[in-house]
């Protein structure tokens, strides 16, 4: 999927509106997407982005959003709505919304090397007659597994998702109001709070089975 890029400008102002529909000035927005470029025949995709966008508006890089999803040719996808997984990187103040499941931004400094284990998560909703599929890499509420970063002195970002396609966790709703049930790859199950299975348990199952991808 292409990367989403957002630049902001102090010189070219824009308008926003309050609850009384009164306008007030805000920094200008310049948002667009750009494709990654594959490096050779391997699995590395790369893009170079200018922090100083220049031009008459003196655009400055504000935020990046990198997203990926399970490809349509994977058998597990059949009959399911696939939800993308995102990372957000902020070089300035918040420019992109929090609605991408990344959690709130955590402060980091220097280059980033992000290697995360992901497990296919199937959510069955009888209420909406729908089954969704996403990649679960931990509850992004606590800081440890968040995927949004407020950057300082960062020049290079490497994202290496490790996807365990044979370690599927399934979430099923109760017959009556109550907690969801998580069914883990080893056949065990448990009631879970909110919508998050145990990431630590998934990592343990992965380790016990040799970490097969």
What are these regions (language model features)?
Residues 83-213:
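A eukaryote-biased signal for long
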Residues 2-116:
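Structured domain cores in non-transmembrane regions
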């Amino acid at each position: 999927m292409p990367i989403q890029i957002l630049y902001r400008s102090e010189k070219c102002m824009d308008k926003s509106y309050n609850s009384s529909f009164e306008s007030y000035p805000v920094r200008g927005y310049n948002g667009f997407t750009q494709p990654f470029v594959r490096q050779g025949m391997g699995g590395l995709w790369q893009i170079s982005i200018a922090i100083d966008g220049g031009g008459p508006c003196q655009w400055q890089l504000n935020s990046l959003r990198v997203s990926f999803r399970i490809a349509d040719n994977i058998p597990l996808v059949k009959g399911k709505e696939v939800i993308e997984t995102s990372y957000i990187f902020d070089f300035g103040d918040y420019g992109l919304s929090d609605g991408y499941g990344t959690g709130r931004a955590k402060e980091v400094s220097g280059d980033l090397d992000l290697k995360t284990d992901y497990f296919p998560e199937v959510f069955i909703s009888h209420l909406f007659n729908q089954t969704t599929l996403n990649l679960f890499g931990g509850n992004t509420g606590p800081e440890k597994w968040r995927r949004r970063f407020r950057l300082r002195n960062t020049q290079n970002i490497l994202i290496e998702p490790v996807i365990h396609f044979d370690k599927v966790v399934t979430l099923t709703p109760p017959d009556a109001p109550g907690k969801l049930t998580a069914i883990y790859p080893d056949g065990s199950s448990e009631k879970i709070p909110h919508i998050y299975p145990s990431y630590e348990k998934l990592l343990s199952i992965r380790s016990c089975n040799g970490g097969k991808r």
